[in-house]
């Protein structure tokens, strides 16, 4: 019974995510490319969790993977979390109105971290904390969730990065 309830909740959440994604992609508008050093993120597990990183230009995102390696990926690679079982449809980026905003210093910090390894921990040393560290230049123990990362957002909204 519990499994059935969880399955139904996941199904409803997935349907909501589809509607939300349609709204974000078609009605609200999109951006052609994030700003260099901008925060980017996508949903995981039907929108229950998110994955974040820093856009470094040329269709590349630097992010902390689940095995603790700092990787540089294109958009598809960035969304391909959870061994390909992630149904993410969109990558979001930080915007002020319709214009993407970034942080050149964050892009540099992200690129310098490329190839390094960390002791990944879902709640203590994750992608959001890595992203926050790139943005601020220092470890930020207060950021482990996506909603905490939002306080470092330079813009006032999130927009979908158009394909």
Each model region followed by its residue ranges:
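Cysteine-nucleophile amide-bond enzymes
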Residues: 1-163
């Amino acid at each position: 019974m519990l499994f059935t309830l969880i399955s139904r909740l996941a199904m409803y959440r997935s349907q909501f995510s589809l509607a939300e994604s349609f709204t974000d992609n078609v009605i609200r508008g999109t951006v052609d490319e994030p700003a260099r050093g901008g925060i980017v993120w996508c949903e995981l597990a039907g929108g229950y969790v998110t994955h974040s990183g820093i856009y470094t230009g040329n269709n590349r995102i630097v992010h902390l993977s689940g095995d603790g390696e700092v990787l540089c990926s294109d958009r598809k690679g960035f969304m391909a979390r959870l061994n390909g079982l992630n149904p993410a449809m969109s990558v979001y980026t930080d915007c002020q109105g319709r214009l993407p905003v970034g942080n050149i210093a964050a892009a540099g910090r992200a690129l310098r971290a490329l190839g390094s390894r960390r002791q990944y921990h879902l709640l203590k040393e994750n992608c959001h904390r890595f992203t926050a560290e790139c943005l601020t230049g220092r470890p930020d123990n207060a950021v482990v969730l996506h909603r905490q990362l939002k306080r470092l957002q330079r813009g006032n909204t999130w927009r979908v990065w158009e394909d």
